[in-house]
Amino acid sequence: MPMMLYIVGTVPFLNAWQRSLHFTKHGHEFGAKNEFDYEAMAEAFMGAAMHPNMHECYRSTGTRDRCRIDANTRHFGVAFNVLTVRTYYIVTTAKIIRFGGADGYVRAQCAMTR
């Protein structure tokens, strides 16, 4: 996989409806004040530099979904075609354990066929 550079400011949600939907579903997990605050958090996460506890992979479904999880914070996100956030939430510790760790969780997400 070629190395790609992600620049914060290039990963917003697809549209206002998607942003609102995901904020309603997950914004409280992050203490986001509003959907724009939540979107900025998602954008910063998906654009952050990789580090030893950040795990990332691409779905092999042809969508070019990039899935990543930070094992330190349990933050998880998916970006479509690299540039559009699909989702952003905090994964429960129990779910991470069930998949054998953060790397196992993100790999299972990349194996999904949706």
Give the location of each predicted region.
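Compact soluble domain cores
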Residues: M1-D65
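Basic/aromatic recognition patch in beta-strand/loop cores that engages polyanionic ligands
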Residues: E56-V82
